[in-house]
Amino acid sequence: MKLAFLISTHTDVQQLQRLVCALPDESVFFLHVDKKSDINIFKLAFLDDGRMKFIDHRVNVRWGSINEVEYQMELVRAALEYGEQFERLITISGMDYPVWSKEQIVQFFEKDRKKEYLAAIDVSFPWRMSAIYQQYFFWIHKPKSGWEYYVTRAFGRALKMLGIKKPLCKKIGDKTYKLYKGAAWWAITPKLAKVILHEWDTNEKLKDWLKWCMCPAELFAQTVVLNDETWKEKCMLDNEKYSLPMHTPLTYVTWMNEEIKTLDESDYDKIIQSNKMFCRKVASGKSDGLIELITKKEMR
């Protein structure tokens, strides 16, 4: 089974090397290196590994902005245009690490070749979430050091105080889109990837609607797919409440002090109990003990 891993990275080459070595040998890795980072450091580290494909289209990534979707779609494009056919396109970050062995990962995807591991929730259900996505985040793509950031943030707050809300549905042509949220990490078939990429390339009104939302990378693919009757039933929809474990179906993630926690050996038991394929985030030094425990488990 041929898998394509679509990896976003910006730091910690040592961790990236460790990640790639732990994934199935027959895989191909498509990498986006943040434009702020020196790509030559990454290329030098993988000089002799023909499986590593660095995409030329690089983005100066700003967390929470639409340009996270931009690089994600360019990774999808690179995989679809590659000379070989893949069974799955799997999005991960360079700070992920597989909890499962190479063999377990391949066997998992071989069991159900049609299921799409892309989860979402209709944001109009939980009140707190709907309130967030009714706000205009004009400042999200602005550098915090510039005056534009503060002006646009003040404008967004003024709209909120005036009760001016961003709609949770958008009519584009003869189709009405509802807003769905999930995670930026998913594993999908090339057929579905083509549908999502086509919308990115052709549906400017959809992109404009999502542009001023918080974290469009957690919205774009989900909104495209869950508004498509052909694909909706093949994905994972939760109609009740937002659940981080459900919306990251293959990845263990936990938060600490409003940030994704850098995992260490104290997290090992919870990671194993989650039965997730990956955990994130891990970093050289701080997570070395955890990686050692996972490696020992795989060798038993």
Label the predicted regions.
Residues 1-300:
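ER/Golgi luminal nucleotide-sugar-dependent glycosyltransferases, focusing on the catalytic module
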